[in-house]
Every structure is written in structure tokens, then in C-alpha cells.
Design a protein with these regions (language model features):
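N-terminal membrane-proximal hinge/A-helix region immediately C-terminal to the signal-anchor transmembrane segment
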Residues: 1-47, 51-60, 79-87, 170-173
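A glycine-/small-polar-enriched, mobile loop at the entrance of the PLP active site in fold-type I
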Residues: 49, 71, 75
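Cytochrome P450 heme-thiolate monooxygenase catalytic core
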Residues: 33-39, 75-236, 252-255
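A compact, surface-exposed functional segment
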Residues: 241-260
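Short hydrophobic alpha-helical segments that form membrane-spanning helices or hydrophobic packing faces
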Residues: 5, 23-24, 232-241
Length: 260
């Protein structure tokens, strides 16, 4: 383990099993995720959530999200995810050979899973209004937000750079988009499915008795959208590549899922 100074901040590099244990299992007195990540994530997610709040508040917000990750909801999501994947394969240009009768097709699996992750997440966790508005303009906002995750923003998050201007504009527009959904639901103009994360968050209160406000919900929804995209895409891609290397177990795994 060693420490060096970068742009006036001390940076500690922790290597090996002991280093991993310090990073992932360290006490709050030893490590602070908020101090490490807030300059990178707060401009993207928005204020008042995740690493822009004390750890105790973050733990409560994690509890709010966990309430929406119920077994009941997951059972509902299975059919929705299946429908999205089938529709994607039947209509996306990447699978044109299959649509024309070919028995196989070659695709960039990571690109495909990146798209599928957005489609399935918006259909399930994000809610029907998000899925219905998932067009090119929404994709552009997502791209501009995602571009805000650049290394320089760890230490200098507000440099007058074009990608930061686009990030800030996209954050405001995305936040207002979610606020509009929440407002219509509270006014009874639209109904959620009851199984998405917006529905779950709208019912939550902090331990002190304060209800979570609509802006916090909007920013938590942005965090959910952004935070899970890369890991889910990478994990899905890895799983598919492993299956491709072991074709003899594909049918066995499929039958297992059918039984479940």
C-alpha cells in the first residue's frame, strides 16, 4: 500500500488480498466511499442521494431500493424480460439474418447486451413510462450522462469542458423527466404497475419521519439507471461467451430455467 498526492489530494493505492479487504470491508473510520466518489457521481446522479449524503442516509436509501427488489416483483419481471429480448431479436437490425431465415448470426455481444440491459431495466425497474419514452432523445441523454464518468472528474469535476456541459444539461433534463412521471402518478393521472422502483420509492420515509421527496426519487432513479448498466452488460456478455465456449450445456441450462 502506498500514497501519493495528485492535484492536492492524497491518493492511496491498496494492492493484493489485503488491499482488497481494506477497500471493500474497511470501516468508515478507515475509508469513505463518499469522499472518494462524490465528485464523480453527484454531477451525474444529482444532489441528495448516494454519495452526496452521509453514510447513514445512504444506508437508508439502500433500504428504500431494497424494498422494491422483492421476490414478487422479480417474478413479474421474468415475463417482461423475456418479451423484451424476444422483441429485440425479432426486430433489431443486428439480427437481420435470423429474421430472414438464417440459422445463425454473428453479433458484438457486448453492444447487444448494452442495448438489452437498457430495454429490460426500463421495462422492469424503471417503469412503463420510461420504457414508452425510450427513444433516440432519451438515448442521447443517457450517453451524455455516461460521458460524465471520466477519470479527471474524480479530482476536478467542474472543469469547463464540453462533455461536462452536456452532462449537466442531460442531468437536469433526465431529472425533470422523472419528476414529471412522479407528479402525474401523485395526481392520479397515470398509474404505475405497482412493481417498478418508482412505485416502491414513493412509499418510503426516513427513520426521522420525513418522506423521501420527489427530487430525491428522480435522482435515485438516475443512479439506478446508470450504476447497473455497465456491470449488467459485462456480466451478461461474460455469461454468453462462456456458454458459447461450452455449447454442450446450453440445452441443459435452458431446461433448468424452464423447470424453475
Amino acid at each position: 500500500r502506498f500514497t501519493f498526492t495528485l492535484f492536492g489530494r492524497n491518493m492511496t493505492v491498496a494492492l493484493g488480498p489485503k488491499g482488497s479487504n481494506l477497500v471493500f470491508n474497511g470501516r468508515l473510520s478507515q475509508v469513505s466511499a463518499e469522499d472518494a466518489y462524490t465528485s464523480l457521481t453527484t454531477p451525474v446522479f444529482g444532489k441528495g442521494v448516494v454519495y452526496d449524503v452521509p453514510n447513514a442516509v445512504l444506508m437508508e436509501q439502500k433500504r428504500f431500493v431494497k424494498s422494491g427488489l422483492s421476490v414478487e416483483n422479480f417474478r413479474v419481471y421474468v415475463t417482461q424480460i423475456t418479451d423484451e429480448v424476444k422483441d429485440f431479436v425479432q426486430h433489431d437490425a443486428a439480427f437481420a439474418p435470423l429474421q430472414k431465415g438464417a440459422k445463425s448470426v454473428t453479433v458484438d455481444i457486448f453492444d447487444v447486451f448494452s442495448e438489452i440491459t437498457i430495454l429490460t431495466a426500463s421495462r422492469t425497474l424503471q417503469g412503463k413510462e420510461v420504457r414508452e419514452n425510450l427513444d433516440k432523445s432519451f438515448a442521447k441523454l443517457y450517453h451524455d450522462l455516461d460521458a460524465g464518468f471520466t477519470p479527471i472528474n474524480f479530482v476536478l469535476p467542474n472543469l469547463p469542458l464540453p462533455n461536462n456541459f452536456r452532462r449537466d444539461r442531460a442531468q437536469r433534463m433526465m431529472s425533470d423527466f422523472y419528476m414529471g412521471i412522479i407528479k402525474k402518478r401523485r395526481e392520479g393521472k397515470t398509474d404505475g404497475t405497482g412493481h417498478d422502483m418508482i412505485s416502491a420509492l414513493m412509499e418510503q420515509s426516513y427513520k426521522g419521519g420525513r418522506d423521501i421527496n420527489d427530487r430525491e426519487i428522480a435522482h435515485m432513479m438516475i443512479a439506478l439507471l446508470m450504476a447497473g448498466q455497465h456491470t449488467s452488460s459485462a456480466t451478461g456478455s461474460w455469461a454468453m461467451l462462456r456458454l458459447a465456449s461450452r455449447p454442450e450445456i446450453i440445452e441443459e441450462l435452458y431446461e433448468e430455467q424452464v423447470r424453475v
